[in-house]
Curated annotation (Swiss-Prot):
Record-annotated VOC domain positions: 295-414, 440-590
Gene: quiC1
Disruption phenotype: While wild-type P.aeruginosa grows readily on either quinate or shikimate as a sole carbon source, the knockout strain does not efficiently utilize these substrates. Growth of the knockout is enhanced by the addition of protocatechuate, bypassing the function of QuiC1.
InterPro entries: 4OHPhenylPyrv_dOase_N, DSD, Glyas_Bleomycin-R_OHBP_Dase, Glyas_Fos-R_dOase_dom, IolE/XylAMocC-like, QuiC, VOC, Xyl_isomerase-like_sf
Organism of derivation: Pseudomonas aeruginosa (strain ATCC 15692 / DSM 22644 / CIP 104116 / JCM 14847 / LMG 12228 / 1C / PRS 101 / PAO1)
Official protein name in the record: 3-dehydroshikimate dehydratase
Length: 634
């Protein structure tokens, strides 16, 4: 099956779009009429450019408001079509998309509509061209694929077929299952788009909020599976109208587009193998299976000598012990429970380059995987960029891929026997690593540019088969923050992704500090929040002070006794409870160098969230702390 994308899905000029589409690895392209109208070359020039780039022009679109027009306009519309046919022949494509009429005065008699399409198809047949008819979700008389198919069937022309678009069906809660019963040869083209699930006018939804497969909330595998079951083996194409995409970097967005199609094919293959195993799936993308990801092995910070010492002191106050020094590099290992933190101040290293670009920051995350080789091959299949660093004497090579911000994701196999990566690379000691009782990394929250959220979600979904939670919009004292978390299938790796379009929010300040994406905060799990925080206070950890009014509100919301509320307030512990009775206790440090901070948390009774209800008070408290405002001592 050929993979395609509509030029309207990308930013830039038509040549820039085509070059990006080819570089990403697409087979073909849909030429959107406005892109052609705004290009200063001829259709033949576009044809030559596509040929030079190895792209096939699979479709020209759209041809609007044709069938069911008032009878006095039919002849003029047919002449209009002839001019578009001229253009198509210059472009070298044989298929045009005709979308259902949206005019207020469009007629609705099925026999008349079918006859109009018949006349159009007969004219196209003279030139060896094909007509693909698509039902727009906001079409005046035709807005479902079933209605469109009825007209195509009635018109009964060999060169007239159906064009299917996932958005137009799923936005109306349509049922695509019946597509499996259509003759596959009468489906001429399939367009795919995802979208967040919104309650709004369908036209506005389509024009502004479509996104690539895997970035929204539609069941696209459930849509594509019956298409494949019908016998269709034609192009799969992306048609995405999105305000953010119109400003996104053209080449990076094209790469995202191809990755999203591959991801959709994989998920459709899995769907078919579960539901209808007799359907052939050989033409659908089949990468190596995702390797089980069951935790974070270590987090690596890029620092220099001075900031490395300062961060090391911070972490030691949080209960981390210096557990080792690298055998040949200026790299330290700090440990507490199953948490391993690496401070890398080695000159002329990857970390040094990252530090020069971003300052003190998280430059690498090591994921625990069952099969590192398989995980790396899957990442390659999805367009991930492998990384190989310079190895010192007797140093173990760890496979890695670059994340979207240029940081590294190491792929570590956790062995129960033999020498660990730390034994190979570090001179370790017998330091007590029990610390405050912190046990593991609970989650790592990232601050991203506003246009980057969908790309990061797709990256983790495709390369690592992570799931994604729904978006949550949270108030900051200076604007709004949007958060969406991705997580490994077993839930042991959680990555809340945060964006803000407002200039003065905490997320925006992080982006300014890092000169790009960066870690927002790191959360550590513990078994006893009050014992851990008591030790942290005693060690001099700068904990974020929470306004006392917050605890008055807790008293109104929950049936807590005064003694327990006083304990929460004394230790600055925030509290949340979910609908199932799960509980979260968490406390935050003040930021390190006004960049990232740490969270200590305890989950009880299956609580799986991140304390969204407490984000506003935490952000307000941080704003107060920046201004030097301290609460009255208890």
């Amino acid at each position: 099956m050929q993979r395609s994308i509509a030029t309207v899905s990308l930013s830039g000029t038509l040549p820039e779009k085509l070059e990006a589409i080819a570089a990403a690895g697409f087979d073909g392209v849909e030429i959107f009429e406005n892109d052609l109208l705004h290009y200063d070359g001829s259709p033949r020039d576009v044809r030559r450019l596509c040929a030079d780039l190895g792209l096939e022009i699979l479709l020209f679109q759209p041809f609007r408001d044709f069938e069911g027009c008032r009878r006095e306009r039919l002849g003029r519309n047919l002449e209009r079509a002839e001019r578009k046919f001229d253009l198509m022949q210059e472009l070298g494509t044989d298929l045009v998309l005709v979308c259902s009429n949206v005019a207020a005065d469009a007629l609705g008699e099925p026999a008349l509509l079918a006859d109009d399409l018949r006349q159009l198809a007969e004219r196209a047949a003279v030139r060896g061209l094909r007509i693909g008819y698509e039902a727009l979700a906001w079409g005046r008389q035709v807005n479902t694929w079933e209605q469109a198919w009825d007209l195509v069937r009635r018109a009964d022309q060999a060169n007239l077929g159906l064009i299917l678009d996932s958005f137009h069906t799923l936005s109306l809660d349509g049922d695509p299952r019946g597509i499996a019963d259509l003759p596959g040869e009468k489906i001429f083209f399939v367009q795919m788009a995802d979208a967040p699930l919104l309650a709004m006018d369908v036209l506005e939804w389509s024009r502004h909020f479509r996104c690539f497969p895997g970035q929204g909330g539609f069941d696209l595998a459930g849509f594509l599976a019956p298409v494949v079951a019908s016998g269709y083996r034609g192009p799969l194409s992306l048609e995405v109208f999105n305000d953010g995409f119109r400003a996104a970097p053209t080449r990076a967005n094209a790469v995202d587009g191809l990755r999203s199609l591959l991801y959709l094919e994989e998920k459709t293959r899995e769907h078919l193998q579960r539901q209808t195993p007799h359907v052939a799936v050989d033409e659908l993308f089949a990468p190596p299976p995702a390797s089980l990801c069951d935790g974070i092995e270590f987090l690596e910070f890029a620092v220099d000598e001075t900031l490395g010492a300062r961060l090391g002191q911070w972490l030691q106050r949080l209960g981390f012990a210096r557990a080792g020094e690298h055998r040949s590099k200026n790299v330290s290992l700090l440990r507490q429970g199953d948490i391993n933190l690496v401070l890398n101040a080695e000159p002329y290293s990857f970390a040094h380059g990252f530090f020069e670009a971003h300052g003190p920051s998280l430059c690498a995350t090591a994921l625990c995987v069952r099969d590192a080789g398989q995980a790396l091959e899957r990442a390659r299949a999805y367009g991930g960029q492998p990384y190989r660093g310079l190895l010192g004497p007797n140093e173990r090579e760890i496979p890695a891929v670059r994340a979207l911000d240029g940081s590294l994701l190491y792929l570590v196999e956790r062995h129960t026997e033999g020498r660990s990566i730390y034994d190979s690379d570090f001179v370790t000691n017998d330091a007590d690593t029990s610390g405050l009782g912190l046990r593991r990394v609970d989650h790592v929250a990232l601050a991203l540019p506003a246009e980057g959220l969908d790309s990061w979600v797709l990256f983790y979904k495709s390369l690592f088969d992570f799931g994604a939670d729904d978006e949550v919009v949270l108030p900051d004292p200076y604007g709004l923050v949007t958060s969406r978390a991705v997580r490994s299938p077993c839930g042991s790796v959680r990555l809340p992704l945060n964006i803000s379009e407002d200039r003065n929010t905490a997320i925006a300040r992080s982006l300014s500090s890092y000169r790009g994406s960066g870690v927002h905060h790191i959360a550590f799990d513990c078994a006893d929040i009050f014992a851990a925080v008591a030790q942290a206070k005693e060690a001099g950890v700068a904990l974020l002070e929470i306004p006392l009014n917050y605890y008055d509100d807790l008293a109104a919301r929950f049936d807590f006794d005064d003694e327990f509320l006083s304990e929460l307030a004394y230790y600055n512990v925030l509290y949340d409870r979910d609908a199932q009775g799960g509980e979260l206790f968490h406390v935050f440090t003040e930021p390190f160098e006004e960049r990232f901070f740490f969270e200590i948390l305890q989950r009880r009774h299956g609580y799986a969230g991140y304390g969204a209800a407490n984000v506003p008070v935490r952000l307000a408290a941080m704003a107060q702390a920046r201004r030097g405002v301290r609460r009255v001592k208890l």
